[in-house]
From Swiss-Prot:
Residues 194-268 are extracellular. Plays a role in virus cell tropism, and may be required for efficient virus replication in macrophages. It comes from the Viruses. This is Protein MGF 300-1L. Its main location: host cell. The lineage of its organism: Viruses, Varidnaviria, Bamfordvirae, Nucleocytoviricota, Pokkesviricetes. GO terms for cellular component: host cell membrane; membrane. It is a single-pass membrane protein. Belongs to the asfivirus MGF 300 family. Keywords: Early protein, Host membrane, Membrane, Transmembrane, Transmembrane helix. It is found in: Host membrane. The chain crosses the membrane at residues 176-193.
Amino acid sequence: MVSLTTYCLKNIVNQHAHVENTVLLYHLGLRWNCKTLYQCIQCNGVNYINSHSDQCKNKDLFLMKVIVKKNLAVARTLLSWGASPEYARLFCRNAEEEQALNLQHVADIPSSKILERLTMSYKENDEQLLITFYLLNLSTKFSTNLHEQVRFNIVSYIICDLAIHQTFKTFYAKNYSLSTLYCIFLAIYYKLYMALRKMVKIYPGLKPFAYLIGFMFDDETVTQTYSSTDDEILECKNKIIVIKGCYGNIHCRSDIDHMYAFSQNNFW
């Protein structure tokens, strides 16, 4: 059942979403980055244009981001729209924030659910992938153990071919976050070029990695944009060529049995 608060917010945003009322909308948690927020009727996500599009944002991911950015007004709105309080509590920095959002009695969320939400569920448009990238790399809430689980989650989901394993291993040795490598991989796999450009701008040292992943998937847009002549990259590229010759095209599977089998082994 939709709450009275949700109905009120919807009525306010529909009647007052113009320039002279932005102060009111900010106080009510209906503005973010100088844009008015709307709840999408079709996908139940959040957008800026009051109609469904491929840029609708997942409410749980968006909730995590606004809490990291300390915007509790928007967080309250997203919670009233049905975003998960468990994920909100995960990103609260102290008891005061939990109390302000009425989360003090919310149970802790299992690490496995956090990983599923952050690294596997939302990877099919630029906006959601960039939010995931932001959360994985800038949040201070993740423990060492959680990052270790992220590592195994990535292994179980992506490293379904020795060529991918070799590429990840090469860059993991250079102290790049596996969660960062994972997001860049997804950007190329799903051809999210805008997200890829933003990620590589933050970590320019990963241009060769983007090139190798693009090479594995025969993506000329990526290989031409991030071409590299580095000797180490050439060596890794040659290994990919050999493996492709032996095993054919690379396939990434995500079924449960396959993921579980990989998660039982340490490939690093």
